[in-house]
UniProtKB/Swiss-Prot annotation:
Gene: mt-atp6
Protein topology in the membrane: Multi-pass membrane protein
Compartment(s): Mitochondrion inner membrane
TM spans (from-to): 14-34, 69-89, 98-118, 139-159, 165-185, 189-209
Protein name per Swiss-Prot or TrEMBL: ATP synthase F(0) complex subunit a
Species: Polypterus ornatipinnis
Signal sequence coordinates: none
Keywords: ATP synthesis, CF(0), Hydrogen ion transport, Ion transport, Membrane, Mitochondrion, Mitochondrion inner membrane, Transmembrane, Transmembrane helix, Transport
InterPro entries: ATP_synth_F0_asu, ATP_synth_F0_asu_AS, ATP_synth_F0_asu_bact/mt, F0_ATP_A_sf
Amino acid sequence: MTLSFLDQFASQSFLGIPLIAIAILIPWMLFPSPYKRWMSNRLITFQSWFIARTTNQLMLPLNTGAHKWAMILTALLLFLMTLNLLGLLPYTFTPTTQLSMNMALAVPLWLATVLIGMRNQPTHSLAHLLPEGTPTPLIPILIIIETISLFIRPLALGVRLTANLTAGHLLIQLISTATFVMLSIMPTIATLTFIVLALLTILEIAVAMIQAYVLVLLLSLYLQENV
């Protein structure tokens, strides 16, 4: 029976343990709930500090009216960051490498920012379609260009996250395959490629966290224009 390379990700169990149970337990272990004690442990303290720090950074450039989005943006950041980091584990599938999922997250949130602007301050929101000081003959062209750029925003959010994560996973796959193949033929070269693989994995951990932050940061900037 011939199996494709991607069939290894379709396994329903690993070492006799259902993968659905592991998939449910790992996020629960990463984000423990606080308990009623005078002093929290180090993990909960770090978790609370990280969430508070991230929320402050996201809400810093926004006015008071946009602070009600703090919970949504912070939850989205933690959700994307968790999926990106878990996707770096061997033999795991990364949902955020799928454009359909990223677009399903980006389009509704982008549309919500646009609708809020059109409802609360339509004149200010429509003013973004025409830069100040535009010559009269260029007004129709610039309005069309700005409208197209407005509708491209959610596509750019989804494609950016998908492309960066997919490229990193492909590089890790290629270098790890080369390391495994050359291990018995050229051990010295295999050692060098393994070092490159370790450095690339560290880089991909940083990319996984940065790309989640960039997507949420851009959403907060879009929100700033309409609130």
